[in-house]
């Protein structure tokens, strides 16, 4: 029997255009209101059937952490054991999204794995079933399963489609250092002393969208700068290059600047690369939909 051709999919980065921490649950999870869109920095995953029934994951570049702790492996294992799948899978993961950068790379890889294996193994799980499984693996996983720019509320499980987003040109910068999400939220909690941002901005975002650079905001940004001054340096450098607005994504350390003009964005990115060899600098347009929308 001829083996089916491998499935190859992209796993894009996400950017938080706004992020407000509006509370904390008794179990320690923080409640958020955040608008997320995609950006064309992406990992690539290849999936091939394994008739032996095993789950095999290889990563490029190689990682030192246990493969069993990788969200890709955990997603495959969750589907295989949860639904009695006899077939296995060989997964090749090529990483481009930095770790600990606030871009959701691990969550994106996880979501792509759930979507791909739902097809490869013929599970025919619904979007709601996949979202429930994804949320159990990570709070950011559902937004990547949703495959559209969205407002996320709660711990990330309540998703609403966003109106059309501006055709901004972005310069996305990672300073080459990582931050612990737990550490950033802990520092933020110490700064606000339990007085979280009042909820309520979400409806305005849904009604009017995110149209202006001054709407960019991240409640975690101050805490991240305190823990990692390089974040502040990146934000300042983007403003110096003429960005109309700047913001940190997620819990950091990646930041981005928005530009109305593509030429200005390209020039800014080039200057930042020349002046900061250790920074990852990428210019591109914000994406309203997942690059693999309709392929699953």
From Swiss-Prot:
What start and end residues bound the annotated signal peptide? Answer: none
Q: Which Gene3D superfamilies match?
A: 3.30.230.10, GHMP kinase, C-terminal domain (3.30.70.890)
Keyword annotations: ATP-binding, Isoprene biosynthesis, Kinase, Nucleotide-binding, Transferase
Q: Which domain of life is it from?
A: Bacteria
What EC number(s) does the entry state? 2.7.1.148
Active-site residues, as the UniProt record annotates them: 14, 140
Q: Does the keyword Kinase apply?
A: yes
An annotated GO BP: isopentenyl diphosphate biosynthetic process, methylerythritol 4-phosphate pathway
Which catalytic reaction applies to this protein?
A: 4-CDP-2-C-methyl-D-erythritol + ATP = 4-CDP-2-C-methyl-D-erythritol 2-phosphate + ADP + H(+)
- InterPro entries membership: GHMP_kinase_C_dom (IPR013750), GHMP_kinase_C_sf (IPR036554), GHMP_kinase_N_dom (IPR006204), IspE (IPR004424), Ribosomal_Su5_D2-typ_SF (IPR020568), Ribsml_uS5_D2-typ_fold_subgr (IPR014721)
Q: Locate the residues binding ATP.
A: 98-108
Q: Which molecular-function annotations from GO does this UniProt entry contain?
A: 4-(cytidine 5'-diphospho)-2-C-methyl-D-erythritol kinase activity; ATP binding
Kindly name one Pfam family recorded for this protein. Answer: GHMP_kinases_N
Give the metabolic or biological pathway.
Isoprenoid biosynthesis; isopentenyl diphosphate biosynthesis via DXP pathway; isopentenyl diphosphate from 1-deoxy-D-xylulose 5-phosphate: step 3/6
Q: Please indicate if the UniProt record lists Kinase as a keyword.
A: yes
PANTHER family membership:
4-DIPHOSPHOCYTIDYL-2-C-METHYL-D-ERYTHRITOL KINASE, CHLOROPLASTIC
Job description of the protein? Catalyzes the phosphorylation of the position 2 hydroxy group of 4-diphosphocytidyl-2C-methyl-D-erythritol.
Q: Which family does it belong to?
A: Belongs to the GHMP kinase family. IspE subfamily.
Q: Which HAMAP family match?
A: IspE
The record ties this protein, via NCBIfam families, to: ispE, PRK14608.1
Please state what the protein is called.
4-diphosphocytidyl-2-C-methyl-D-erythritol kinase
Q: Which gene encodes it?
A: ispE
